[in-house]
Amino acid sequence: MYVVNPEEKVIEIMKQTGIDLAATLPCDRIKNLLPLVSENFPEIKLTREENGVGICAGIYLAGGKPMMLIQSTGLGNMINALESLNVTCKIPLPILASWRGVYKEGIEAQVPLGAHLPSILEGAGLTYTIIGETEKLPLLENVILDAFENSRPHIALVSPKVWEASECCAWQAAGMPIKPEIMERTCRFSLTSGTLKPFMLRNDAICTLASELDDEITVTNLGVPCKELYACRDRELNFYMFGSMGLVSSIGLGLALRSEKTVITFDGDGSLLMNPNALLEIAKEAPKNLIIIALDNGAYGSTGSQETCALRYIDLEIFANACGIQNTAKVNSKEGVIEAFRKFKAMRELSFIHVILKPGNTNAPNIPMSPEEATKRFKETLDVKKF
């Protein structure tokens, strides 16, 4: 009689519970599971776990049912995002975490975090379920269902013992990745001895672009940028960030992958530098309906305008090019912003507009909605309009 391997059981549970996208980062203990995930689901292969939190949030907001499959060490860089985005905004996310450091662990460095993970998750108020042996694997169904029914993250800590007796050979069958003999990469940029002089404040650029919006979806960076957009032009298709710095364009990527509408992210230099992996994932997935607006004033505007590396050292447009984003522009005027936006919107290709700005904030008031209320309004609008 054929016995279902635990890896196959996971795939079965994911299908039964309606998962329609997997965001993954590998672990040796689930190396036979991951090829099956790739075969059975649309997959985003992540470069950083926290980035996956943002991408999956965008996928969910646009109507999808994503799930993450990672090594448990990645939870260390995810906790703030899970708290400030998923918990605060009531965004579900089931996570299968290959639990290292607790069972026949051969790498000493895995032990400190792994041994304390249950206590850490409890202290953070994050829901988790321990799956310590193969017979407990059906609990994964409860993890997934609970995440979506209660609009929260739910983590399955899956012990290596679960896979210990498996006869699955999917990893061996998949073989090693083979680098193409010929790889064509296109990268266009220009280097000059000077830089564009800033004339506008961030609010000028935001309000200029806000006047151009029709039925586009927007995602805006936390703090003052959100407040400035709300004051300029509040729309039900605006997703406002209240935390999770660095995940603006990650959320935009998730939305763009699930929606046919143009998605615009109002990102910042500090935010992009905090999570440069976002541009790597975006360039790899290359959604044609995503326009990234990099509002670069060389400062952390919401925390006192402290200098960022973009002020003197990093050119964000060149970095976007290096990541693989081909359609870019650098502008420093309202006319330039409008021209670049209209051009890229008409092209309908992944695009990046680098806006050079002066540091400084307006006195825009706080957004008079809670994160949960703002998120609910946004998602309900997408659901009704079926974007």
Curated annotation (Swiss-Prot):
Top-level class of the enzyme under EC nomenclature: lyase
CDD domains: TPP_ComE, TPP_PYR_POX_like
Record keywords, A-Z: Coenzyme M biosynthesis, Decarboxylase, Lyase, Thiamine pyrophosphate
MF-aspect GO terms: sulfopyruvate decarboxylase activity; thiamine pyrophosphate binding
Reaction catalysed by this enzyme: 3-sulfopyruvate + H(+) = sulfoacetaldehyde + CO2
Alphabetized InterPro entries for the sequence: Sulfopyruvate_deCO2ase_alpha, Sulfopyruvate_deCO2ase_bsu, THDP-binding, Thiamin_PyroP_enz_TPP-bd_dom, TPP_dependent_decarboxylase, TPP_enzyme_TPP-bd
PANTHER family: SULFOPYRUVATE DECARBOXYLASE (PTHR42818:SF1), SULFOPYRUVATE DECARBOXYLASE SUBUNIT ALPHA (PTHR42818)
Homology family: Belongs to the TPP enzyme family.
Physiological role: Involved in the biosynthesis of the coenzyme M (2-mercaptoethanesulfonic acid). Catalyzes the decarboxylation of sulfopyruvate to sulfoacetaldehyde. Is not able to decarboxylate the analogous compounds 2-oxoglutarate or 2-oxosuberate.
Name of the protein described by the UniProt record: Sulfopyruvate decarboxylase
Species, as recorded: Methanosarcina acetivorans (strain ATCC 35395 / DSM 2834 / JCM 12185 / C2A)
